[in-house]
């Protein structure tokens, strides 16, 4: 018997990377998972890859910055499964560079995906979870919210906002059995800066990485806590990644 048998989850950005890793961890434990993203090909590939797991995997193409599409995502999930136990707000965007060179388009795109997306997801999830007497929301943040990556002001600011949103939602949710938490990854997969520099902005060689499976296992731990317990915040990073002293 899986740890998530009978549970239903939505994972945004679930077609690849961290989101796919979390979706895999959930379906392997019997969860019915709906993955959402804009890229339909990645969604189709992820569904094909995860078929045959103990749980079920379905996809709904969704732009997390589009309010109408987000409302539809939750409506379709409820029509198919009748409940929602877990939401993972994972969709994310990165942009950066010297602050004097950044455009409003760059700034707004990161904020829309990284902040507006989780807000819309949480809003729709709260409507459902309040009625059913509880649920769990996991927001994917970043250690950038505490130790910023060099030349990353839009991304760093957005992840500070995600942490603030998480705390506010956790406060609102506690009277309704809704646990809200943030999972902050360090370097995962290809999170490396495009110019070859490390988080400090210096050329220091390849940075250590954790796998999407590591993220999946951690999200699973958070998702399978007893209903009256919440891991408000978790940080997952390579043992030898610069973190303390990073800046």
Q: Where is each model-derived feature located?
A:
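Conserved glycine-rich cofactor-binding loop
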Residues: 15-17
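The beta1-alpha1 cofactor-binding region of Rossmann-like NAD(H)/NADP(H)-dependent oxidoreductases
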Residues: 40-41, 61-72, 104
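Substrate-binding pocket helix/loop in short-chain dehydrogenase/reductase
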Residues: 98-99, 106-108
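Active-site loop immediately N-terminal to the catalytic Tyr-X3-Lys motif
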Residues: 100, 147-153, 207-208
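Active-site helix of classical SDR
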Residues: 122, 158
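Residue(s) in the substrate-gating loop at a strand-loop-helix junction
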Residues: 142
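C-terminal helical subdomain
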Residues: 175-178, 182-183, 190, 198, ...
